[in-house]
């Protein structure tokens, strides 16, 4: 079995964990959590991770929740945290976990240099004195003892943006957290009162696209999907803040979708962690046929320099670029 470079660093110290109750969290990259020898392992999943298959091992427990509770970690004595690409997301997750983890627990944080993992020392300086214990292949493993619990309130981590009288609420790590994405604004400028019926928002993030549609056409029935639990929480908060209603579901693209829609809308991510990845957009295109009604529409925004004509031709007989500028373009395709 091949493990990521971050997991390989942890494996070099596997003797430490043999007689411990270990809590895994963060940007878990592979199957190490279900293979590391421990007394008991708890795995905190905050997004869909297909490589981690739930098994029948009684010593392994999965928690698929945005937030950790006292009951989840009160018997744990080690945290292994995979640092994500986003520092504010790491701070959000760690402040939640460390507000409940027992004092004197051992904390292990692993991440690549390019992700900004070194900033963990400063972010957590009041709770842990982190020290580097190993490094290899541009990754670092740090550890320390929890000396002070953090203070955590979910509402304090929401960032609020206002756009055309809409309130957009976003948690750290959610796309468009620092500011509303310009590509999202660009596709939103194509929305009109003519949009109707059932709408599927793929990769909903903060819920910006859905509330932008509802602002123009409030009778639409929106379904918002994302693989990240922080995005789902943000979308719910955005709907509530604007007094709109919608269905918010956990789904890795279409994995949890079993009905058809009049329109699928998306601002697909171009990055998978720190790497550029076009696969998500391709999957949205190729599998949209299964989830569109007759004459249904797929509408998505992308960078001006990228072309998806080749892939759209394989699925749709009719498509065009409905709007473009020197940065973005919006594709519109119809299922005949």
Swiss-Prot record:
Keywords: Cytoplasm, Methyltransferase, rRNA processing, S-adenosyl-L-methionine, Transferase
Source organism, top-level taxon: Bacteria
Pfam families: MTS, MTS_N
Location (main, coarse): cytoplasm
Compartments, record wording: Cytoplasm
Gene3D superfamilies named among the record's database cross-references: Vaccinia Virus protein VP39
Molecular function terms, GO-annotated: 16S rRNA (guanine(1207)-N(2))-methyltransferase activity
Cysteines engaged in disulfide bonds, as pairs: none
UniProt cross-references to InterPro entries, sorted A to Z: Mtase_sm_N, rRNA_ssu_MeTfrase_C, RsmC/RlmG, SAM-dependent_MTases_sf, Small_mtfrase_dom
Cellular component, GO annotation: cytoplasm
EC numbers: 2.1.1.172
Recorded catalytic activity of this chain's protein: guanosine(1207) in 16S rRNA + S-adenosyl-L-methionine = N(2)-methylguanosine(1207) in 16S rRNA + S-adenosyl-L-homocysteine + H(+)
Sequence similarity: Belongs to the methyltransferase superfamily. RsmC family.
Function: Specifically methylates the guanine in position 1207 of 16S rRNA in the 30S particle.
Subunit structure of this chain's protein: Monomer.
Record-given protein name: Ribosomal RNA small subunit methyltransferase C
Gene expressing this chain: rsmC
